[in-house]
C-alpha cells in the first residue's frame, strides 16, 4: 500500500520520483546515537531562583540632579542627531528652530518627537518655534496651558 501512495504522489508531482528497483531496498545505516544516550554533555544544576543574602544589594531610588540643559540651534536636518544624543544621555534640550525652513523644522520635530517617545520623555512648546524636550526622569511643570497657542506646532 505504501508503494502505491509513493507512486501516486510521484505521478502527481507531490514527491520525488522513486525508481522501482529502489522502492523495496532496505538501506543499512549506522544507528544514530540517541540524545538520551549521549554522555558527552554533562548536565548543569539549575540556578537557585532565590538570591542568597550575600548577593542582595540595597537599591536606593534614583533622584536626578540636573546640572545642565543643552540649547540646540539646528541649521539642517542632520543636526537633529544632536538632539537624540543629548536626550539619550539624559540631558534636557531647548530646541530653537528659528534658523531653519518650515519643512526642515517639521522634519526635525518629527525626528525629535520619535526620540522623546522612545525614551518616554516629554516635549513642550515654549514659543512658536522653540521647544523643550526632556527625558523621562525630568518633570516639566507648565505654568499656563491656556496661553492662546494652538495645537498646531507652528501656528499661533
Swiss-Prot record:
Record GO cellular component, one term = cytoplasm
- Superkingdom, according to UniProt? Bacteria
Pfam families named among the record's database cross-references: SepF (PF04472)
For bias kind Acidic residues, which ranges apply?
Answer: 18-35
Q: Which GO terms describe its biological process?
A: division septum assembly; FtsZ-dependent cytokinesis
Say yes or no: keyword Cell cycle present.
Answer: yes
In this chain, composition skew of type Polar residues spans 47-57
**Would I find Cell membrane among this entry's keywords?**
no
Stretches the record annotates as Disordered? 15-58
Q: Enumerate the subcellular locations listed in this protein's record, separating them with semicolons.
A: Cytoplasm
Keyword terms: Cell cycle, Cell division, Cytoplasm, Septation
Q: Which family does it belong to?
A: Belongs to the SepF family.
What this chain does, per the record? Cell division protein that is part of the divisome complex and is recruited early to the Z-ring. Probably stimulates Z-ring formation, perhaps through the cross-linking of FtsZ protofilaments. Its function overlaps with FtsA.
Subunit details: Homodimer. Interacts with FtsZ.
The entry's protein name is Cell division protein SepF
Its organism's taxonomic lineage begins at: Bacteria, Bacillati, Actinomycetota, Actinomycetes, Bifidobacteriales
Amino acid at each position: 500500500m505504501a508503494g502505491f501512495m509513493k507512486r501516486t504522489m510521484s505521478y502527481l508531482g507531490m514527491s520525488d520520483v522513486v525508481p522501482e528497483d529502489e522502492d523495496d531496498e532496505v538501506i543499512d545505516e549506522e544507528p544514530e546515537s540517541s540524545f538520551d544516550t549521549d554522555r558527552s554533555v554533562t548536565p548543569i544544576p539549575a540556578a537557585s531562583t532565590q538570591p542568597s543574602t550575600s548577593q542582595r544589594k540595597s537599591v536606593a531610588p534614583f533622584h536626578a540632579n540636573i546640572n545642565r540643559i543643552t540649547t540646540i540651534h539646528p541649521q539642517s536636518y542632520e543636526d537633529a542627531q544632536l538632539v537624540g544624543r543629548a536626550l539619550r544621555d539624559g540631558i534636557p534640550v531647548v530646541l530653537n528652530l528659528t534658523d531653519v525652513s518650515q519643512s526642515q523644522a517639521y522634519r526635525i520635530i518629527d525626528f525629535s518627537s520619535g526620540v522623546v517617545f522612545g525614551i518616554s520623555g516629554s516635549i513642550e512648546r515654549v514659543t512658536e518655534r522653540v521647544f523643550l524636550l526632556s527625558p523621562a526622569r525630568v518633570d516639566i511643570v507648565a505654568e499656563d496651558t491656556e496661553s492662546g497657542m494652538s495645537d498646531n506646532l507652528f501656528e499661533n
